[in-house]
Amino acid sequence: MPIIRANTGIVTQINVFTVPEGGQDALIDYLAEAAKFASTTPGWISASLHRSRDGTRVVNYAQTESPEAAKQVIERLRDGGWLERNKAFGQAHPGLYDVVFTLER
């Protein structure tokens, strides 16, 4: 389950993919399998996939316990060929983030 609280030390990777028309489902299926693969990495917390309503984007919101764990997850995915293969589904725009503010009702 995602943890969205400020100043926890948790690292959030937000990766926005642009996909060709009709390409969301294939990418979502692929990213779900990649998340299952990554989930056994120490420090991995969660992955959440989002589809845009206009059909042009998929967002992967993934969390790890620390910067070191984020690096391990990325290296494991790279070594397993997952990062190279995802290029067939769309263009990735990844970034690592820290939550700095939240507001809840």
Kindly give the residue locations of the regions a language model identified:
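Short, surface-exposed ligand-recognition loops at beta-strand->loop->(often short) alpha-helix junctions
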Residues: 16-30
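Short, low-order "capping/linker" segments at domain edges
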Residues: 98-105
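Hydrophobic transmembrane signal anchors and adjacent membrane-proximal interface regions, especially
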Residues: 56, 84-85, 101
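Short, well-ordered beta-strand segments in beta-rich or mixed alpha/beta enzyme
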Residues: 11-18, 46-77
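Solvent-exposed, flexible loop/coil residues
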Residues: 48, 93, 105
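Surface-exposed coil/turn segments at beta-strand junctions on protein surfaces, enriched
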Residues: 6-8, 20, 40, 53
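An amphipathic, aromatic/His-enriched active-site/gating alpha helix that lines ligand/cofactor pockets
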Residues: 2, 6, 33-45, 63-97
